[in-house]
Amino acid sequence: MNGYIAAAIAVLIWASYPVATRAGVTGSFTPQELVTLRFGGGALLFLPYLLLQWRQVSRSAWLQGVPLTLFQGAGMGALVICGLQFAPAAHQAALGPGVSPAWVALLGFVIFARRPSTRAIVGATLCATGVLALASWSGMAHDARVLAGDAMFLAASVLGALYVLQL
């Protein structure tokens, strides 16, 4: 039962992020302010450690850590926040974490020659069908701004997939 409670809490956290961010972007915050709020606090907490220990961090740790930070950190966050200026939170929820497994399968094949399982191929095909349906709906509404936001969500999802593959 504890696993179900933990899963429910995780879903609530993931589901609240695009809604809260959309409210911030459409309210009084600029995307730059939201990115600063999201990552600035953690950066300030980490800064003293970094200043004291940066020479002890190996070159390989830097080469591995910096891309991870950009993939799952500021790069992905900035794309999501900027995309929420143009597209609804529901699109981010569908095109962000909803499409990430398809990107992991595709990029894993392209970059590492990992052949995806039949289930992964079926799942990626269903994800692509959903993306096309969402894009055609936005395109029929002749709303280029929504399509731009959707493209940012897909780019953020690619960064999330690269993060998973980097691990």
Where on the chain are the PLM-derived regions?
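Alpha-helical transmembrane segments of compact multi-pass small-molecule transporters, enriched
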Residues: 41-45, 95-110
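Residues that define the loop-to-transmembrane-helix transition and helix capping
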Residues: 29-32, 90-91, 117
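Cytoplasmic-side transmembrane-helix entry/capping segments in multi-pass membrane proteins
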Residues: 4-8, 60-70, 116-128, 150
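Glycine-/small-residue-enriched transmembrane alpha-helix faces in small-molecule transporters
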Residues: 1-37, 142-167
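Hydrophobic/aromatic residues within transmembrane alpha-helices
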Residues: 24, 34, 38, 83, ...
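Hydrophobic transmembrane alpha-helices of multi-pass small-molecule transport proteins
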Residues: 46, 116-138, 157-160
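Specific transmembrane alpha-helical segments of multi-pass solute transporters/efflux pumps
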Residues: 13-18, 26, 47-96, 105, ...
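Hydrophobic residues within membrane-embedded alpha-helical segments of Major Facilitator Superfamily
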Residues: 6-13, 18-20, 41, 71-75, ...
